[in-house]
Structures are given as C-alpha cells and as structure tokens.
C-alpha cells in the first residue's frame, strides 16, 4: 500500500509530499493538482513495470513551467508483506535536444539497498542486502523493469509486485468500442477501455470473484442475471437481464453510459479493493445517479480494512460529505503556482463540506 509520495519539478508539484491512509479523498477546486497526483502515480507504475520509458512517462510538458530546473525527482514509499519499500527516481532533461533519461534510480527495503542505478550502471543487492555484480542498463527505462524473480532477489521482485498492485483508473464509458475481447490482459488500463480483456483474464482464473460481482450487481439491480463472453471473432461482453421471466442479453456497447460506469466501478472494487492492493479512482461518480453514488461509497467503506487502500477524486456532494470529515486531503493552488496541502475549511453555520465548497469556501486556483 502507498505510504507517501514526494515530488519536485513535476507540473504544479514542487517540493510536494502527500501521505496516504486506508481511505483518502482528494479535494480541491479544478486545477489544484488532484488529477496530477493520480496520473503521476500511474506514470510511475507504468515506468517501473517497463511499460513506458522516460520520454512517455515524464515528457517535457510535465516540467514545472515557472522553473528552469533540468531534473525531476520522485520518491514513493510502499508497504508490502510487512516491509517498507522506498523508490527514488531522478529524471534528467536536456532542454536543447529535447531528450531526457534516468539520472538515478534507487530501491530501499527497510532502509537497506536493493537496487542502485546511476549513469547507466546498476548494482543489485540480494535478500541479505549483499552487493551483486554491476550491470549495464538502458538510461531511458527503469532498470527494475528487467529484474525477474530469482531465489536470491525475492525482495526486489516483491517491490515490483507491490507496484503492480497499485490500480489507477479514470474510467470513461464512452467514445470507444470496448465490448470486444481479442486477448486476455491482466491489468486494466487508465481509462478502463480494455475492460473486456481483463474480464476474460479474471473469469478464467478467479471465477469466485466473478460470482461475488454478480451477487453485488443483483443487489443493486434485481433484474440483472449475469455477464458472459460470447462470439467467435473476438469475444463480446454481454449483460443478461430478466424481463418478466424472459432473459435478454445486451452487448456492453448497448447499455447506457451509466450502466457501463456502474459495472466498471463495482468490477474495480470487487476485483482490486483487496489485501495489499491500492485502488486509485479519478472522478468515478460521473454518469451514475445520486442513489447509486450513495450505495457505492457505502460499499467501499464496508470493504475497507487496514490492509487495503482507496484513493478517490470526487466533486460529488454525497462522496464529499461521506468521506471528507475523516478521510479528506484538501489541496489548494494560488495564482497557478505550486500545489499545497491546506487545512480543511471551517464553517460556523453548521454547513456540510459540500455546501461550504459550493458556496466558495475554498480558495480557487487563481
């Protein structure tokens, strides 16, 4: 699970640190940096797992505009299997040639070195923290991405597992056809556009979870029966409903945006809001009704433990009033400068947090 992240020289995040608990709701007006935090964690995850390189994960447009510093720095702290891992990364930019590369990359486990890379060379340490041979690495990629599980290096591989179990999603239930599944995929992408591919992967490896999801969806919609894949040329994800004793099926693209969003959200929570997982959702309550939002936040609260984690961004009054009093992290940004963590707004009139926000009780990103 995420403990904290430190960032410098990335968009509006300058000498910035944010700590996380089990449930976290990021709050603040548009432009204060909420989505920047979520998307940065997604970028770090993709980079560490070898899915992107420095040019894709940390493009020039991510440099802080009002500074002329050629280095970005990041520090990510995770807890996994009772060990605390710290990941440190520095990305160096050549402004003239419009290129960037890894300047330094370090992994610590309980304060001990597991991986230390600098200037294209890396040292890997075994589970007893003894130094191994020096290896050459690609300056444009994470050296950790090429580390595979070995008996002597289980801790470093556990770090990769911990990163892989950070699930980041900003679900968008429109603008693409995502009903066809041509291949299994283990990880959901940022917009959930590959939901059918991940569904295919999970239904074959963890059918018990799928049965649990069906039961949850039946409690929300008593006419829901099941979901299933069917079709020869690419399997189509179908939803089956009961209408007066007659079962009818609809492809994922045939149901409404709200129904698709509801399915994606409960799919995410049931499949990934589990032990040692961190689930990060950017504005998940778009497209769904007020009662459905209330059911969703209660469902998340009921499944929360000290072993799983959820980070949310939401402007929805129900979500704000449910989570903000105990789990809110308030962000502000003045004059389009640096993002900072602010104290919660105060009210002497007994207003809820959502009412305070709607009446301008927080500083805008001026």
What are the language-model segments listed below?
Residues 11, 24, 42, 256, ...:
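Catalytic acidic motif of RecA-like/P-loop NTPases
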Residues 38-100:
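Conserved P-loop NTP-binding catalytic core
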Residues 1-14:
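N-terminal pre-Walker A segment at the start of P-loop NTPase domains
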Residues 31, 218, 222, 226-270, ...:
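Conserved ABC ATPase signature
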Residues 86-219, 225-228:
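Electropositive, glycine-dotted interaction segments
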Residues 291-366:
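C-terminal lobe/lid and adjacent interdomain/linker elements of RecA-like ASCE P-loop ATPase modules
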Residues 15-21, 272-274:
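Phosphate-binding P-loop
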Residues 20-61, 262-268, 316:
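Phosphate-binding glycine-rich loops of NTP-binding sites
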């Amino acid at each position: 699970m995420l403990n904290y992240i430190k960032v410098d020289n990335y968009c509006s995040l300058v000498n910035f640190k944010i700590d996380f608990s089990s449930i976290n709701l990021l709050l603040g007006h548009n432009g204060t940096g909420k989505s920047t935090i979520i998307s940065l964690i997604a970028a770090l995850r993709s980079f560490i797992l070898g899915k992107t390189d420095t040019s894709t994960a940390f493009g020039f447009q991510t440099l802080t505009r009002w500074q002329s510093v050629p280095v970005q720095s990041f520090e990510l702290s995770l807890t996994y299997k009772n060990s605390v891992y710290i990941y440190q990364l520095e990305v160096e930019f050549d402004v003239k040639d419009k290129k960037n590369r890894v300047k330094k990359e370090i992994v610590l486990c309980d304060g001990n070195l597991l991986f230390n890379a600098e200037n294209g060379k890396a040292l890997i340490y075994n589970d007893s923290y003894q130094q191994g041979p020096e290896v050459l690495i690609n300056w444009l990629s994470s050296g950790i991405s090429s580390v595979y599980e070995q008996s002597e290096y289980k801790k470093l591989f556990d770090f990769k597992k911990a990163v892989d179990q950070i699930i980041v999603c900003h679900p968008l239930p429109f603008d693409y056809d995502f009903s066809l599944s041509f291949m299994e995929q283990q990880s959901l992408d940022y917009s959930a556009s590959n939901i059918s591919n991940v569904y295919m992967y999970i239904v074959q490896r963890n059918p018990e979870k799928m049965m649990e999801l069906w039961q949850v969806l039946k409690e929300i919609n008593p006419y829901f029966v099941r979901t299933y894949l069917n079709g020869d040329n690419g399997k189509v994800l179908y939803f089956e409903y009961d209408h007066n004793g007659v079962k009818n099926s609809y492809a994922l693209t045939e149901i409404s945006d709200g129904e698709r969003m509801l399915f994606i959200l409960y799919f995410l929570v049931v499949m990934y809001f589990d032990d040692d997982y961190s689930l990060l959702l950017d504005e998940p309550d778009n497209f769904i009704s007020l009662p459905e939002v209330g059911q969703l936040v209660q469902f998340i609260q009921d499944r929360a433990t000290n072993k799983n984690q959820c980070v949310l961004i939401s402007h929805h009054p129900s979500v704000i009033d449910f989570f903000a009093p105990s789990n809110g992290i308030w962000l502000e940004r003045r004059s389009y400068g640096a993002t900072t963590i602010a104290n919660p707004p105060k009210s002497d009139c007994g207003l809820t947090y959502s009412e305070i926000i709607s009446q301008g009780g927080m500083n805008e990103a001026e």
